UniProtKB/Swiss-Prot annotation:
It comes from Escherichia coli O1:K1 / APEC. Pfam families: DUF3461. The gene is yaeH. The lineage of its organism: Bacteria, Pseudomonadati, Pseudomonadota, Gammaproteobacteria, Enterobacterales. Disulfide bonds: none annotated. This is UPF0325 protein YaeH. InterPro entries: UPF0325. Belongs to the UPF0325 family.
Length: 128
């Protein structure tokens, strides 16, 4: 699993926290950030540089002109797919945790309101 990341020398892909991708001249720069350990100020990161792939395509629908375009390297595309799998998994876990906490807070308020209602009913009974 995560063969493309392992080919970059990343032995523990599960420790990846996030990544960034930017274009610089004719290259794409991929920076991968790892989870911080306790007591660390900065997350460890590694940087990779990929030359952009050049293609010649028809410039207009008539087919009389051509232009050169650059696009992301196919290898980098596969690496980004793996990074997205890792980072999306982490986001969905965070979203689930947030949902559970929200549900607990809602349940807490419902129970608190119900307890107040029951106590008010008991108070009415004891006054009679």
């Amino acid at each position: 699993m995560y063969d493309n990341l392992k080919s970059l020398g990343i032995t523990n892909p599960e420790e990846i926290d996030r990544y960034s991708l930017r274009q610089e001249a004719n290259n794409d720069i991929l920076k991968i950030y790892f989870q911080k350990d306790k007591g660390e100020f900065f997350a460890k990161s590694v940087k990779f540089k990929y030359p952009r792939q050049r293609k010649t395509v028809v410039a207009d629908g008539v087919g009389q002109g051509y232009k050169e375009v650059q696009e992301i390297s196919p290898n980098l595309r596969y690496i980004i797919d793996e990074l997205d799998q890792i980072c999306q998994r982490d986001r969905s876990e965070v979203d689930l945790k947030r949902k559970i906490l929200d549900d607990l807070r809602h349940l807490e308020s419902v129970v608190t309101n119900k307890i107040s209602e029951i106590e008010a009913d008991l108070e009415k009974l004891t006054r009679k």
